[in-house]
Amino acid sequence: MPRHSDSLLIPPNMPDYERARAEFSWAAARALLDGLPDGRGLNIAHEAVDRHAQSGRDDHVALRCIDLAGGRRDITYADLAGLTSRFANVLAGLGVAPGDRVFVLAGKIPELFVAAFGTLKARAVFAPLFAAFGPDPL
């Protein structure tokens, strides 16, 4: 990893952590977020996925997944927005209400992110479970 940010191909989004920390304010951070359409609040899934899909970045890569064999799967913001909305609709169809907990047992696969953002779109609480912890904790 290069020691100096001027040697990077893509500049870092926070080149001076100490300055960013000293100048941080919640009001400025909130101003960077879109909020839900019609001013209905804030949803992290909308901020992380939907606003990018709706603002001309729909064909940009949102997730790049590399499997154990080295195969690559790119998922665009448009695709991720659609998949996560479908997951949120499935949850609603199952009777999951805002504030309910949704537990997901999955490996580090693209569907884990779909489930996470879909759950957050449904205004439910996402709780990942990982088999690596063994059967006792699960």
Regions found by a protein language model. Name each.
Residues 1-46, 52:
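Flexible, non-catalytic linker and terminal segments flanking ANL/adenylate-forming cores
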Residues 18, 136-137:
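Short acidic active-site motifs
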Residues 43, 78-82, 129-132, 136:
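Conserved phosphate-coordination/catalytic loops
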Residues 48-79:
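AMP-dependent adenylate-forming
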Residues 49-52, 80, 84, 102, ...:
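Adenylate-forming
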Residues 70-75, 90-133:
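Conserved AMP-binding/adenylate-forming
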Residues 84, 112, 138:
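Aromatic/hydrophobic pocket-lining residues that form the small-molecule binding cavity
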Residues 85-89:
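Solvent-exposed alpha-helix faces
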